[in-house]
Amino acid sequence: MEGAKRADANLLTDTGTESSPRSPVCSLRHFACEQNLLSRPDGSASFLQGDTSVLAGVYGPAEVKVSKEIFNKATLEVILRPKIGLPGVAEKSRERLVRNTCEAVVLGALHPRTSITVVLQVVSDAGSLLACCLNAACMALVDAGVPMRALFCGVTCALDSDGNLVLDPTTKQEKEARAILTFALDSAEQKLLMSTTKGLYSDAELQQCLAAAQAASQHIFRFYRESLQRRYSKS
């Protein structure tokens, strides 16, 4: 818990439609979010974390092919498009992780025999891409009015060779890391919805990273709320 307290002390405290940049007293890069950017999807959002940017579009609930129909809930699909080229193994893996997270919070039983499709376009990848994809997906689902039991966010942690924890790492920090851990958490109880890891770490380091991610999630959810409040107060 000591590691979590240290991490929490270094987190952002002022958030809004755009948050402050990373500084010696801030462990997260700056955030920015804009919703309702695209006309064709039912909901859309652009999410920026530092220089990592993802554009998300949500289609549905809509009619679904009989072959994909699920009688008691909506069929949820996630499509991730890289900045350049065709989707590969990494994109397919991230699609599965984002889909699993969305399925854990979307109230699909309210729209049986329909489809909800989340399309993610990578605009730029400067580290913590999966976390940014999760955050963009959440804000696009909110914009589309898809019913959810809670919001969710993604947080990436990196452990360097000395065991130091870095939240929201850049590409350079990821390359130098001994381990990279990404968590998806809900807004109701900071409950763990999904986790994926790469590299070597101890059980104690895993718990330290999870505690730091849970602390960081509170600030991301505050950013969500203030971003939404600013948007709807203008309309």
Curated annotation (Swiss-Prot):
<dbReference type="InterPro" id="IPR015847">
    <property type="entry name" value="ExoRNase_PH_dom2"/>
</dbReference>
<dbReference type="InterPro" id="IPR050080">
    <property type="entry name" value="RNase_PH"/>
</dbReference>
<keyword id="KW-0963">Cytoplasm</keyword>
<dbReference type="InterPro" id="IPR036345">
    <property type="entry name" value="ExoRNase_PH_dom2_sf"/>
</dbReference>
<dbReference type="GO" id="GO:0005730">
    <property type="term" value="C:nucleolus"/>
</dbReference>
<dbReference type="GO" id="GO:0006364">
    <property type="term" value="P:rRNA processing"/>
</dbReference>
<keyword id="KW-0238">DNA-binding</keyword>
<dbReference type="GO" id="GO:0005654">
    <property type="term" value="C:nucleoplasm"/>
</dbReference>
<dbReference type="GO" id="GO:0101019">
    <property type="term" value="C:nucleolar exosome (RNase complex)"/>
</dbReference>
<dbReference type="GO" id="GO:0000177">
    <property type="term" value="C:cytoplasmic exosome (RNase complex)"/>
</dbReference>
<dbReference type="GO" id="GO:0000176">
    <property type="term" value="C:nuclear exosome (RNase complex)"/>
</dbReference>
<keyword id="KW-0539">Nucleus</keyword>
<dbReference type="Pfam" id="PF03725">
    <property type="entry name" value="RNase_PH_C"/>
</dbReference>
<comment type="function">
    <text>Non-catalytic component of the RNA exosome complex which has 3'-&gt;5' exoribonuclease activity and participates in a multitude of cellular RNA processing and degradation events. In the nucleus, the RNA exosome complex is involved in proper maturation of stable RNA species such as rRNA, snRNA and snoRNA, in the elimination of RNA processing by-products and non-coding 'pervasive' transcripts, such as antisense RNA species and promoter-upstream transcripts (PROMPTs), and of mRNAs with processing defects, thereby limiting or excluding their export to the cytoplasm.</text>
</comment>
<dbReference type="InterPro" id="IPR001247">
    <property type="entry name" value="ExoRNase_PH_dom1"/>
</dbReference>
<feature type="modified residue" description="Phosphoserine">
    <location>
        <position position="23"/>
    </location>
</feature>
<dbReference type="Pfam" id="PF01138">
    <property type="entry name" value="RNase_PH"/>
</dbReference>
<protein>
    <recommendedName>
        <fullName>Exosome complex component RRP46</fullName>
    </recommendedName>
</protein>
<dbReference type="GO" id="GO:0005829">
    <property type="term" value="C:cytosol"/>
</dbReference>
<feature type="region of interest" description="Disordered">
    <location>
        <begin position="1"/>
        <end position="21"/>
    </location>
</feature>
<feature type="compositionally biased region" description="Polar residues">
    <location>
        <begin position="12"/>
        <end position="21"/>
    </location>
</feature>
<dbReference type="GO" id="GO:0000178">
    <property type="term" value="C:exosome (RNase complex)"/>
</dbReference>
<dbReference type="GO" id="GO:0006396">
    <property type="term" value="P:RNA processing"/>
</dbReference>
<dbReference type="GO" id="GO:0000791">
    <property type="term" value="C:euchromatin"/>
</dbReference>
<keyword id="KW-0698">rRNA processing</keyword>
<dbReference type="InterPro" id="IPR027408">
    <property type="entry name" value="PNPase/RNase_PH_dom_sf"/>
</dbReference>
<comment type="subunit">
    <text>Homodimer. Component of the RNA exosome core complex (Exo-9), composed of EXOSC1, EXOSC2, EXOSC3, EXOSC4, EXOSC5, EXOSC6, EXOSC7, EXOSC8 and EXOSC9; within the complex interacts with EXOSC3, EXOSC8, and EXOSC9. The catalytically inactive RNA exosome core complex (Exo-9) associates with the catalytic subunit EXOSC10/RRP6. Exo-9 may associate with DIS3 to form the nucleolar exosome complex, or DIS3L to form the cytoplasmic exosome complex.</text>
</comment>
<feature type="modified residue" description="Phosphoserine">
    <location>
        <position position="20"/>
    </location>
</feature>
<dbReference type="GO" id="GO:0006401">
    <property type="term" value="P:RNA catabolic process"/>
</dbReference>
<comment type="similarity">
    <text>Belongs to the RNase PH family.</text>
</comment>
<dbReference type="GO" id="GO:0051607">
    <property type="term" value="P:defense response to virus"/>
</dbReference>
<dbReference type="GO" id="GO:0005634">
    <property type="term" value="C:nucleus"/>
</dbReference>
<keyword id="KW-0271">Exosome</keyword>
<keyword id="KW-0597">Phosphoprotein</keyword>
<dbReference type="GO" id="GO:0003677">
    <property type="term" value="F:DNA binding"/>
</dbReference>
<dbReference type="GO" id="GO:0006402">
    <property type="term" value="P:mRNA catabolic process"/>
</dbReference>
<dbReference type="GO" id="GO:0045006">
    <property type="term" value="P:DNA deamination"/>
</dbReference>
<dbReference type="InterPro" id="IPR020568">
    <property type="entry name" value="Ribosomal_Su5_D2-typ_SF"/>
</dbReference>
